[in-house]
Regions:
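PAPS-dependent sulfotransferases, especially Golgi type II membrane carbohydrate sulfotransferases
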Residues: 1-101, 219-238, 244, 248-251, ...
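Pre-Walker A adenine-sensing motif
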Residues: 101-111
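Pre-Walker A (Motif I) flank of P-loop NTPase domains
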Residues: 115-118, 256
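Glycine-rich phosphate-binding P-loop
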Residues: 120-138
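Post-Walker A helix-loop "phosphate-sensing" segment adjacent to the P-loop in P-loop NTPases
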Residues: 137-147
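PAPS-dependent sulfation machinery
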Residues: 150-259
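Flexible, glycine/threonine-enriched loop-and-boundary segments that flank and lead into catalytic domains
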Residues: 253-279
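Conserved phosphate-donor/acceptor-positioning beta-strand/loop module used by diverse small-molecule
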Residues: 273-298
Length: 435
């Protein structure tokens, strides 16, 4: 994404998608396939689908209603975008109903113990995925698989499939969904490698509280994003913890192993994470902020263009520069006020990528855990199987998003100085990059 041609969302929508959107618009004009996003209608549909009525409280209602308002008034969704949004909201509501029903019938789920988790807290594109997937190679940690992050709650058919020795229907659903995503947005694979069974972050679980940045990545919803930034999201994190218990219960995980958590959203909601897990061990990776902003803008752009043709790269650039700046400020404030030194550890992206064994040894020393030979071998195996750029190089330019590299550097200099983060090129204001 480094040509002189101005980026346009429509150029990223494949011809079959354009034809499908055209057909759906025609159907909508005839009163068919309008994909109603009305919250009350979606709640009623979830209840009808499951035969259940208890969502486990109403903390999700305000963010869901605000989300729908932003989708209707700001996102300018195409018909496919409306369909995807409706399907996503209905899936989340359905899972909440199944989750509440499950803990009522199986109180042992809530009784499960959870050791203090290890949480990777860093900006998107700062090495958090690489770090999590390396550490998840160590069998002494619990981690999510991609399909579990989408469908964390087993529904009746899942139990039936397991009893009959058949594949979990959630796995089949995610495999089909990933194929569709990679067809519609093939460039995503170079940004964030996707696989049904790959280690994945828990932002999909936070989404079940309707308080997640995932919605921001797929639609232009600034009003919802501002609410998310400025309101406490403890309720969503509490529900995330419940879902982790459900997943562990269904897998019959040992109760003495800690979860390995990771999500860039923790930068924004570190206060909520610590409300739920006050003694979590935080691992905080840091990368050249100029690179982070450019890579983040490209990541968001490649996702958001699927569902709207009117979003502009300049809007993405300004929104995510501002968001990055605020997330950094907020996380630093929370760390200074609420996290004791023995519970936080800083590591540079450069160290993770150039000498991963040394970086990992420092992390394990901080955790007070041995970095065993078996864990090292497993980590090296993951690296050997996941060479950088195997899905294509992720290319981007700040100028594609209307951003001046010097302005980005000036606004985020406080962060670079705080952690002595090195520049990733000899010219600190070089705008074109990979990764």
């Amino acid at each position: 994404m480094t040509t002189n041609k101005k980026l346009q969302a429509i150029d990223y929508q494949r011809t079959p998608m354009r034809l499908l959107n055209g057909a759906l618009r025609g159907a909508g004009a005839l009163g068919i396939a309008r994909f109603d996003l009305n919250p009350s209608a979606l709640i009623a549909a979830a209840k009808k689908k499951t035969g259940l009525t208890d969502f486990g409280g109403d903390s999700f209602l305000e963010p869901m209603e605000l989300l729908v308002q932003s989708l209707e008034n700001e996102a300018d969704l195409n018909p496919l975008g409306r369909f995807m949004s409706k399907s996503s909201i209905l899936r989340l509501l359905t899972d909440r109903l199944y989750a509440q029903d499950l803990v009522k019938r199986h109180p042992e789920i809530l009784a499960r113990s959870m050791p203090d988790p290890v949480a990777i807290v860093g900006l998107a594109r700062s090495g958090t995925t690489r770090l999590q997937r390396l550490m998840a190679s160590d069998s002494n940690f619990l981690h999510l698989k991609s399909w579990e992050s989408v469908y964390p709650v087993p529904y009746p058919e899942c139990f039936t499939a397991r009893a009959n020795g058949k594949i979990d229907p959630r796995i089949t659903a995610v495999e089909k969904g990933l194929k569709a995503v990679l067809y519609m947005s093939p460039q995503i694979a170079a940004v964030h490698p996707l696989d049904t069974f790959e280690v994945e972050e828990e932002i999909g679980l936070i989404q079940h509280g309707f308080s997640t940045q995932l919605f921001e990545v797929s639609a232009k919803i600034p009003t919802f994003a501002e609410w998310l930034m400025t309101h406490n999201q403890t309720a969503a994190y509490e529900h995330m913890a419940l879902l982790l218990k459900i997943i562990s219960w269904f897998r019959d995980d040992p109760e003495d192993k800690p979860w390995l958590l990771k999500s860039p959203q923790h930068m924004q909601d570190l206060d909520a994470l610590l409300q739920v897990f006050p003694n979590a061990k935080l691992i905080c990776p840091h990368r050249d902020p100029v690179k982070v902003v450019g890579s983040s803008c490209s990541m968001v752009w490649n996702a958001i263009v699927r569902d709207s043709a009117s979003v502009t790269p300049e809007w993405v650039g300004q929104e995510w520069l501002r968001k990055t700046e605020r997330m950094l400020q907020k996380s630093l404030q929370v760390r200074a006020a609420s996290v004791p030194d023995q519970n936080q550890y800083d590591v540079l992206y450069a160290d993770i990528t150039t000498d991963w064994e040394h970086a990992m040894q420092g992390i394990y020393n901080f955790l007070g855990r041995p970095l065993t030979p078996d864990a090292r071998i497993a980590m090296q195996g993951w690296l050997d199987s996941n060479q950088q750029h195997q899905h294509g190089a992720h290319k981007y330019s700040l100028t594609d998003f209307g951003l001046d590299p010097q302005e980005v550097e000036q606004r985020l200099m406080f962060y670079r100085k705080r952690f002595n983060i090195p520049f990733e090129s000899t010219n600190p204001h070089t705008a074109t990059a990979n990764n």
